[in-house]
């Protein structure tokens, strides 16, 4: 089990806003589950946003009025017979806090009130909800989570990201159709967080490298590329023409068993080999080094991969990162990968 405190550190790299001074005290708090951690982040983040002021936008509103405002909705006025009362249905834009971002935050806070978090935290969230009295609750199943951000709403990006993790990583539907907030993120959400954490860690802690989630082009003999999938890397680290491609893996089992023998997951190995060989061919006319690594989140299995293979002229490594240790140990392992790959 990954300590909740380490999940906070992973989140702080995935969401750079969490490294601001306002959130520093969260690093020293003890959280008994991930739901409590997310609630604390939202609690702090919303409080900061309230000091700036809740975001506002022009929101369409329709109501019965005695004087014309905006556009007259004739058909609706006739249908509701408001004209008999010397009123009419008008549709206009209102500059309001009832925006979708605020609706997402309010709805997520209401979900957290049903979760296994402390009463103190619930009381704090209820106090914050008072500032959202003019904001509607929405069904988070139908939210478009990929909305663009601009200068006016940039401060919401981390808050909405945490709401997304709570809804998609902690909310679980029971057999009777009801929902329950789980204590810890599901495997799929932890996998995405693990990938994002690794990429952002290397971006921040190793600025001497270029760190990106780059695509690799298929090296084809002709122009036929129909139906070929994109080769999307998790992390590509480069320094000049020295390149390390890392494929981050967060599984319940790091190896597979075949007739009682542990082996690496075939698909994982085929994937990283394909990435490396296509990148190798792309740079064939330049002086370069391309290597690959499968970096598993370590489980409690007896077999822990720590292997390096030389395959057709390229180095492919398999490592395990122990997330169940003090974060300084995690950082040391990640830094050691750079030392061995770029400073030899």
Q: Where are these predicted regions, by residue range?
A:
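Terminal, charged accessory segments of proteins
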Residues: 1-179
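A short, highly charged nucleic-acid-interacting micro-segment common to nuclease
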Residues: 149-153, 179-198
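Catalytic core segments in nucleotide and nucleic-acid processing enzymes
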Residues: 187-344
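Short amphipathic alpha-helical segments at helix-loop
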Residues: 144, 182-183, 260
């Amino acid at each position: 089990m990954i300590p909740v405190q380490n999940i906070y550190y992973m989140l702080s790299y995935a969401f750079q806003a969490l490294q601001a001074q306002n959130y520093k005290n969260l690093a020293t708090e003890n959280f008994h589950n991930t739901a409590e951690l997310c609630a604390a982040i939202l609690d702090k983040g919303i409080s900061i946003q309230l000091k700036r002021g809740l975001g506002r936008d022009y929101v369409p509103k329709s109501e019965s009025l005695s004087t014309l405002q905006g556009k007259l909705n004739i058909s609706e006025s006739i249908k509701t017979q408001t004209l008999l009362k010397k009123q009419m249905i008008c549709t206009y834009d209102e500059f309001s806090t009832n925006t979708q971002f605020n609706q997402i935050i309010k709805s997520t806070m209401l979900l957290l009130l049903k979760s296994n978090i402390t009463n103190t935290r619930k009381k704090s969230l209820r106090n914050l909800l008072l500032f959202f009295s003019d904001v509607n609750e929405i069904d988070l199943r139908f939210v478009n989570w990929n909305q663009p951000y601009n200068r006016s709403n940039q401060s919401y990006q981390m808050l909405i990201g945490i709401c997304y993790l709570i809804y998609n990583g902690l909310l679980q539907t029971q057999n009777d159709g009801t929902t329950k907030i789980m204590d810890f993120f599901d495997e799929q959400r932890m996998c995405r967080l693990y990938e994002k954490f690794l990429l952002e860690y290397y971006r921040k802690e190793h600025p001497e490298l270029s760190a990106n989630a780059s695509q690799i082009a298929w090296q084809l003999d002709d122009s036929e590329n129909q139906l070929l999938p994109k080769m999307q890397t998790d992390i590509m680290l480069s320094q000049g023409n020295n390149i390390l491609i890392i494929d981050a893996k967060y599984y319940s089992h790091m190896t597979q068993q075949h007739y009682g023998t542990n082996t690496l997951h075939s698909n994982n190995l085929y994937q990283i080999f394909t990435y490396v060989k296509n990148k190798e061919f792309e740079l064939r006319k330049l002086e370069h080094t391309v290597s690959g690594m499968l970096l598993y989140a370590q489980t409690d299995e007896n077999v822990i991969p720590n292997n390096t293979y030389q395959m057709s002229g390229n180095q492919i490594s398999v490592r395990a990162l122990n997330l169940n240790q003090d974060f300084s140990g995690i950082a040391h392992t990640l830094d050691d990968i750079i030392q061995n790959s770029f400073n030899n």
